[in-house]
Every structure is written in C-alpha cells, then in structure tokens.
Amino acid sequence: MEAEGVIVVRELDLKKDLLEVEDLERRCEVGNSGKISLFTDLHGDPISRVRHSPAFLMLVAETAKEKEIVGLIRGLRVSPSHRRMGIGLKLVRQMEKWFGENGAEYSYMATENDNLASVKLFTDKCGYSKFRTPSILVNPVFAHRLRLSSKVTVIILSPSDAESLYRKRFSTTEFFPRDIDSVLNNRLSLGTFLAVPRGSYSADTWAGSDRFLSDPPESWAVVSVWNCKEVFTLEVRGASLAARAFAKTTRIVDRALPFLKVPSVPELFSPFGGHFLYGLGGEGRSAGKMVKELCAHAHNLAKELGCGVVATEVSNREPLKSGIPHWKWLSCDEDLWCIKRLGEDYSDGSVGDWTKSPPGLSIFVDPREVKD
C-alpha cells in the first residue's frame, strides 16, 4: 500500500469495492452529449479481463479521508472530478513496482492513438516509448451463415496439436506467450482451426502437427478463437433513431431473404458479445484465401453462440491482413502500444533492448490481454 497526500493506492478488495468500482466505471465511460459511446459490462466482475492471466493485480486509488475510490488500473480510469491530480501516475508507478517484484523485464500498454491524455501520461511522465501501431479489425455477425469454399477443408486441432504447431512456427513472433499451452487449454478458448486445400489433409487422415509440418500443403492457415462474451459485453449508445432504424431494417431483410446475402448490421444498441481471433498465421501463396475461409468459419461459430461481432488485432505489416474481412467503421486502423524497459540489467540475449527493435511482420496478441 502507498499513501501520498490524500490519495491511497491499494489492491482491489473485491468484496467491499465492487459497487464503487462499477460506479467509477460508469462515470468514466459517459460519452459526450450527442456522440456515440461504447459502454462495457463486466458482468459484476471487475477483474474478469485479467483473472485468466497467470499472475494479475488490480489497484484502486481512494481518498484517505472519505475512503472514496477515485481511480483504478486494469484499464486506467480516474474519476472526472479527480483528474490532473497525479492519481493516474501513482497507479502506474505502483503497478510497475509489482511488475518488477514479479520478474517482469518490460511493461507495455495499449491505448487509442487519439487518447492524448493517456499517451502524454505514459510517454512524457512514465518513460514509455511508442512501440507498435497494430490494427483492430472488427466484422459484424450477420443473420445468415457464410458459405465456405468447397476447395478448402477446415480441421479442428486438439490443444496439444495446436500448441505444437504454434511453438514450432510462431514462437519467435513478437508477444508470443510462453505459456501458450495455458491459453489453448483455457475454457474461453473455443478451438484452433486449420485451413488446407481440399484433398491434402482431412480430419480422418490427420496424423498430428509434427507430420503436417514435415509435409505441409502448398498453402495453409491457422487461427484460434477466444470467447470474450463470457468476459464482458459491449453496447453502443448515443446513436440516432435513423441509424437504429436502418440497422434494424438490414437485419429484417437478412433474416427474411437470406439468399440475398445482405450485409446486415447486428444489434449493437443493446448488450452484445464477441469472439476474438488470435494466433492467426499461415504460409503459401494462397494463405490469404485460407484466412478468409477461417474467418467465415469463425463467423458461423459466433452466430451459433449469439455474438454480435468477431474481432482480431494484427500488425499493420501483417501479410495476411488483406484476407481478414472487416467493416472499417467498426475497426481501428491504428491502436497504439507503448513499451518501457523496467531494468537496465535485463537482457534478451542477442536481441538486446526490445524497446529499440524494429517491428516484425506479425504480432501474436495474447487473448487474455484483450481490452474492452
């Protein structure tokens, strides 16, 4: 625990802090009048987004006298009435201290590129440097199922096969989690799916990842699906009546005349859930087409489970990015990741200081760290 002036930073007490934390979240998420805002429902569990990590901590900042919670860090939130008082900085410093105590060599954060207050806090006051600008790609789930190509076979991999494939092909990708086995075996991971040309492999002829990698087809792609709906739901508020009416009309037409394949707007104006695609990769000239088929398969899975969107996050330089269907107005071209080296004595061997390394073609986004 840390006390500076009238603000105390301490660990969240889930039993006594729940209502105050929920109230703070609501006050921080109120959008500007007349503008569209995105609201998040954590289903009464403030640590739902971090509890699946091997180690996690959530801190709150409260006034020493009134015991009022005025800030928290999971995503960084500070009460509008207590901003510009250094509370965010105190929360970040205390979290970094915990990182160091747990052996972390680096700390990184993600924010929107246009969140100037957040960017300034981390880069100017906390010593972070702008590191990567990945793209968040979001596609709606339509009322109709998507048809997959008859030229492609989609195989469901076991967690052990998926782990073997990921470690042997993607372990050097930036942000690859060392405990990928824990990710794949988590109850929120709905499966890993491999797309191959029809006739090359099938569920009946599949002999494991080792055999596959020793004799791969000309092109293939892989992706895993994470169920964010069980962690949080979202809701778009502030949309005009005209926008709501248009969206409803597209859904009615899609359901009534599915053969028209109308790209309907999902019901985003009431709470909706989503699936997150992670571990996306592949090889070969037609890998992008394979990715497109996997995204269609993921769309149909999301439809079965009542989700409103399917999302992923990839490097801006990702070679397979063009194969990922998405709606531009739902997506974010440039998310911003900032990074800081916590200790000068740390080293990554021949790589050296990671904060100064050039970006690779791909990144591996840990689904446990997906922000609302």
Give the ranges of each region predicted by the language model.
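Residue-level recognition of the GNAT/N-acetyltransferase active site
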Residues: S79-S81, E112, G282-E283
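A conserved beta-turn-beta hairpin within the catalytic core of GNAT-like acetyltransferases
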Residues: K67-I73, V265-L277
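Amide-forming acyltransferase catalytic core, primarily the GNAT-like/NAT-type
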Residues: D17-R26, V30-M58, V119, T123-G273
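C-terminal functional modules
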Residues: H299, K303, C307-D372
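Conserved acetyl-CoA-binding loop-helix of GNAT-fold acetyltransferases
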Residues: V78, R84-W98, D124, S286-N300
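Conserved GNAT acetyl-CoA-binding A-motif
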Residues: G71, F99-D114, P134, K303-N316
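Conserved active-site alpha-helix within GNAT-family acetyltransferase domains
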Residues: E101-G103, N113-S135, N316-W337
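An N-terminus-focused feature that recognizes amino-terminal "leader" regions
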Residues: E2, V8-L72, R83, L89, ...
